[in-house]
Design a protein with these regions (language model features):
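Solvent-exposed coil/turn segments that connect beta secondary-structure elements
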Residues: 33, 67, 76-78, 128, ...
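A short acidic-to-branched-hydrophobic micro-motif
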Residues: 61-90, 148-151
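Surface-exposed amphipathic alpha-helical segments
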Residues: 43-45, 87-103, 145-175
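Signature of long, low-cysteine stretches enriched in small and polar/charged residues
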Residues: 42-61, 93-143
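C-terminal motif of bacterial Sec signal peptides marking the signal peptidase cleavage site
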Residues: 15-18
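Post-signal peptide N-terminal segment of mature Sec-exported envelope proteins
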Residues: 26-51, 55, 65-67
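Bacterial N-terminal signal peptides that target proteins for export
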Residues: 1-11
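Bacterial signal peptide processing site
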Residues: 20-22
Length: 175
């Protein structure tokens, strides 16, 4: 019986040593309750004025960083919905430019629900920052006048599909 207990304890120790506490997933709802996502750590928010190819707006970024990987949601509102598609393209281009990158995959979709237009883009890009290979995976979405970017950016070898899919897949527009 003692051997079984020792073996069980040893096995538990081995299994637990493989667990990584680095990702501490938590559900987060934006301050105005317009969106929700699951972050891998405690997020912080900041706002700043940006220029989306000539359209000036204020973007709020909410992000968490884990092991040099940034998980972020950005949101802004345009004066009218007509510029939404161009705004998404400008947001995407700026992020790809930030990593000195090139788009390796992209897909665009659009739909209309109750007269409200929804446009989304899925993007993957690779590049370098400060001489280090970087990877960006993003979901860009327009709902009427509101634009959202849900992105994971980090060292190319550290950005894993499991965490990326969990984060981006958890994003929901609530209103």
């Amino acid at each position: 019986m003692r051997k079984i207990l020792i073996l069980a304890t040893a096995l538990a120790a081995v299994l637990l040593s493989g667990c990584s506490p680095q990702f501490n997933w938590r559900e987060f709802t934006s301050k105005d309750a317009s969106w929700q996502v699951t972050f891998p750590g405690k997020p912080a928010a900041a706002s700043r004025d940006i220029d989306l190819d000539g359209t000036k707006t204020t973007m709020t970024m909410t992000a968490a960083e884990v092991d040099d990987i940034v998980f972020a949601v950005g949101e802004t509102e345009l004066g009218d919905a007509a510029g939404a598609s161009a705004g998404l393209a400008a947001m995407q281009a700026a992020l790809v430019r930030n990593i000195g990158g090139a788009v390796t995959h992209s897909a665009t979709a659009s739909s209309s629900t109750n007269g409200a237009m929804r446009v989304s883009r899925e993007v993957e890009a690779t590049g370098t920052r400060a001489g280090h290979p970087m990877r960006l995976v993003g979901h860009f979405e327009a709902r009427g006048r509101r634009l959202y970017q849900v992105v994971v950016i980090g060292p190319a070898t550290a950005v894993k599909p499991e965490q990326t899919e969990q984060f981006i897949g958890s994003f929901k527009v609530l209103k």
